[in-house]
Amino acid sequence: MALKKTEIYSTLWASCNELRGGMDASQYKDYVLTMLFMKYVSDKYKDDAFGDIVVPEGGSFDDMVALKGDKEIGEKVDKIIAKLAEANGLRGVIDVADFNDEEKLGTGKEHVDRLSKLIGIFEGLDLSGNRADGDDLLGDAYEYLMRHFATESGKSKGQFYTPSEVSRILAKIIGVDDNTPLDATVYDPACGSGSLLLKVSDEAPRGLTIYGQEMDFATTALAKMNMILHGATGADIYKGNTLSSPHFVEGNQLKTFDFIVANPPFSNKNWTSGLNPESDEFDRFTWGIPPEKNGDYAFLLHIIKSLKSTGVGAVILPHGVLFRGNAEAHIRQNLIKQGYIKGIIGLPANLFYGTGIPACVIVIDKNTAQSRAKGDAGLFMVDASRGYMKDGNKNRLRSQDIHKIVDVFNSQLNLTGYSRMVELDEIIDNDYNLNIPRYIDASIDEDQHDLTAHLKGGIPVADIDSLESYWQVLPNLRKTLFSELKHSGNGYCECLVASTEIKAAVLAHPEFITFAEQSLTPFNDWWQATQLSEITKGDRPKALIHKISEDLLQRYEIAPLLDKYDIYQILMDYWSESLQDDVYAISQDGWQVGAQLRKLVVAKGEKLKEEPDLIINKVKYKAELIPPALIIDRYYSDEQAHIDALQAELDTISSTIADYVEEHGDEEGLLADAANEKGSFNKSSVNARLKLATDSDEIEALKQLLAYFELEANAKKVLKEAQETLDLAVFKHYPTLDEAAIKTLLIEDKWHATLQGRIEDEIERITAQLANRIKELDERYAEPLSQIVDEVEMLGQKVQAHLQAMGVA
């Protein structure tokens, strides 16, 4: 059975985090990621004499498994890792974590149990098939773990990881495409764990030649392991200080590269350590020397010097580089004059693990620099600061945010409040200040109140006109909802529908019904074109989702009112939640995997990590792809209807009991003495009281309650038997499912129904926005000042009359 991506992720993280104890995540990651590496290379290469990695005798994960429970497990695990490291030139890479460190891993039995359980987590994973279909499950799992470790590590220790969403943006805006050759070079001077380099390399069909330098020893090891896990075994990753001792040089010059990406440490205060910028042997600071206590521009200047004359780079830096003065202003002015800066993308705040401050992407393009230097071309700016989702205590870019940024930047689209081309003259007029809000107004217009409408009543026509995008699609709906008032000045309308009925009126309007139907047409056409029934073993899920998601995006290009990126996000969310697991399973094991049920086995004393779908004779089962509800809906709807009726009957009886107890169970009620110690009523407590009762009314009440209890017990018994009968029928139905039935259940009943339902929800959300705005306007101006004054006067007269009647006025 194929491993589900989400199963790998959740199992690894939950289990590893459980074993972490009090250890800092920044330290524990070294143990977990080393173990993942050992498991992968052992599964992948132990029987491959010509593989990229040699697995020596006594140096495999299998040897670790044999150590579970061994009193010397820590020392022996270190020796196993050392053998693999020695055989592959990986000393100082995979042997960084000390598995015999009792201070971190505990002593005695605690140490043995912790390592034995850690090995046991990975023992259950078969990673031999990773990348066999061109999809990097393991690399993605590695990145998933790093994301979580970065989140847990806190502000000072999470800088080794650039969020994959940001990496994807950089990879897609520097010009790597299907025509980029394998010998094209990509370089990251502050490569961290290497995820940014790998994202760029993945954009080329055959990969790129990778170079990276990283100052931190443990992080360099992470990067080297990451390269191997992603199949980039030829990557050249070097440990060292890029600014003071750049490793990649040719003669007395810096080596130059086709592409450069980087997320260097923000505002490094020690960037001059080991370096005299005034006499830099590589002439990196020709355009100016950055401030001694702020190294942002030091990295940018190093990148520019390291680019070929046709090279393109993208670097993540804090927003301050766009507008800070003094030395940085001088450097910025020189870079603009040289035309090096092609564009700037402003990102949301709090995306990165090392800092919460907002950052930007500066894109350097030497190939087109001359036209910008002459003023023939401008500098393209994007303000993407408002497109994100909350993810715990961080912000995170969604798939739609990434796609929009990339689309807009690569096509240089001018979108109001989001992006525009800024000419050199305008930048000069702003004294070379590149602060994005100077050029793009992304603020939301304040909702203005109309004083005349508050005084005289009516909804301002200007407010109704502001909904013009709706009226273009629903012109007659406007006439249905509003009519013009004829008081002074005109320009005001009244709402013809009660405030509480506005949404219903919109939904029932013929134009809306037509709009809703037409909004589903692109989806229906797209669905027919996806040909998901043609998925076969060996297909590449990542290629599939790329193809169908791009097609869906294109089909909603001109759909009125709907945002094509919102529709795209619906598909990508469902892909992450469920669809990718289904497709991965089918691509590895075929459609028949849909008929499989997996028995859930849990060790004694442990809890189930998954909720069972079926329980048959006390044995718990998990459906791999098709939940029982889908089989029930298609094949056992009558039986389910019967169960629903039985449940309703039981609910009625239970409600009757609750009402009866509420009526007679208070302190002076007939059932007052029938409650148990906890104050509740059950068959035992009522029978006990019945033996002592002498009052005929009390006896009758007790017997009535017992009769209700009997009815409830019988109803529960009948319901339980019916449910067990249905569960057994469904259980027996799974093995009878043929490929055609599985495809129908998955494609139509699960995938199509879910996606269509969510798009219908999006259509309704758009409608709700219109209805809510109209309701807001109607209620805002419902009581003009004159009406309020009249009401106050009327109430005053009533009070005066009452006072007179009382003789006090």
Feature-to-residue mapping (PLM):
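Conserved Class I SAM-dependent methyltransferase catalytic core
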Residues: 11-14, 18, 27-37, 237, ...
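Glycine-rich phosphate-binding loops of NTPases
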Residues: 387-415
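Hydrophobic alpha-helical scaffolding
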Residues: 108, 131, 212-216, 259, ...
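Non-catalytic, mostly N-terminal accessory regions of nucleic-acid modification and defense proteins
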Residues: 1-178, 238-247, 346-349, 373-383, ...
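Active-site lining segments that contact anionic ligands and/or coordinate catalytic metals
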Residues: 256-257, 294-296, 310-316, 338-342, ...
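Short, well-ordered loop/turn and helix-capping segments at boundaries between secondary-structure elements
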Residues: 37, 229, 266, 309, ...
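Conserved S-adenosyl-L-methionine
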Residues: 156-262, 267-288, 297-298, 317-320, ...
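Extended, highly charged linker/hinge segments and catalytic-adjacent loops that couple domains
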Residues: 259, 270, 276-278, 378, ...
